[in-house]
Amino acid sequence: EEYKIPALTSVPVRSLSEFFLGAEPIWYDIFTNKIHKTNHLQKTKNESFKPKHVLIIGAPLTGKSTLLKQLAVESKELGSVLYINEITPEKARLLFREIKNSQENVYVFIDNAVDSSEAIQTLTNLPNIKIIAAERDFIYDTVSYRFSSQQFNILDVSGLNDFDIQSVIDSIPQGINKQNDSFSHDEGDMNIEPSFLEVMTHVIKDNSLADRFVDALKEFKKRAAPEHDLLLLSCYLYSCRIPISVDIAAAYLRSYDYDAIKAFKMLSSMDTFLYPYEGQLSDDNQAYYVPRSRTVSEIVMRKTYHKDMAKMLETFHQEVSPTRISRYDIFKRYAYDAKLMGRAFPDWEQGLSFYEEAFTRDRTHSLKQQGALYLANKKKYELAFIWIDEAKSITGNNNPTIRNTYAVILFNANYDKPNSPDVLLTLEESMDILQRCYNDDYRKIYHARIFAEQAIKFKVKYPDISKRKGYLELSMKWLESELKNRPNDKWMNRLTRTIRRNLK
């Protein structure tokens, strides 16, 4: 029952404007039938009739969750329909038994597919089930081996065609101020279909949800430090795909002498920005909350003053035990991201101290890997090598993502040094490692992109040797192969054009 699509009479009502300003779609938005159904909906529906399961991918704010909900509603006429935002392996095994015993055809729609990948593998063993799942493209790229081509058809839904663009613009509610009534391809990359986010950014004049969050943080900082800290923490946790609980809030606000009751009242009072959360990551003993959009949370993290970010991160990881975090296994995949820490800790010594402290709680290769990337980004290559070597010692030499990171650090550490036989050998070694990663691993796009970026730089430093080695030609071959399945991938399209220019 918990995974069935709710009835219209039971869902919260809100203005559709919230959706167009950046909030995540809710069932009421879908039931109004006022959100344009793009051509990707029909394509995904057609794929769902084929033997394989379907995984739709795309950049943030490209309409994946909206499409998934729209298709779930339309599929009710085909059989039993379930919609899942997250599901634990244990719940998946229970669901497996229920579906197996029912013997009816069941369509299961799963958002945030990577977080539920173990559960998905359990459910795919049933012959009477069809899974249609969604995930962000860059997250899928790093774990694509979990969704094999034997089981899944992959659909990229990032781009909008001309008809969809104008239909989306025409469906924007009257209450939202527009600065444009159309979108020209001149506004974006003319060779790539624009995304929903690009169209909205060009057309809508009103403050986005992200701007409202940032403005609220500034106001809270002036007059109410606890509210500022709690809202920023909520954004951090949701960017890590975890809700904030009263338990976490009370532990975090210990220095303000807040107990659970005070923390609950504060979370409840911020209903303009935080929604009550009742999903799989919650329990019945306390209240949970999430910001109105994960993408908005990530934008807020990028726009927040770095000292505020650093203070929040250090306080959270000192005061909040991992045992208080529901699905810590999901949280830790995103919690120590090198780019995020690079913004929070511009001083590398402070950042190193943060990672060293974090490793006392989370002794995994992935944390060491992120620490190595952070240090490499700060050009502390000797320390970065120590950290990535320690990651390799934890996993052995068989983890392609660790080998990929080692190759990247090796290349960047030596690239700016004066040309010499030793420098050349290290750059060639890096390229060789990436070639082996590409050949040995299912995550082809992940390795092809890094190889292409390095091939372009290699040609600048050693043009004659680059030509003899054929790095650019090999990059072009790999990228063109991947673009057949991802024609609107902006990163790969830009890399392909750059390589083409370098080959002339």
Feature names for model-found ranges:
Residues R241-I394, P400-N404, V408:
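C-terminal leucine-rich, beta-strand-based interaction scaffolds used for sensing/assembly
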Residues F138-I139, R146-D186:
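Conserved small helical "lid"/interfacial subdomain of P-loop NTPases
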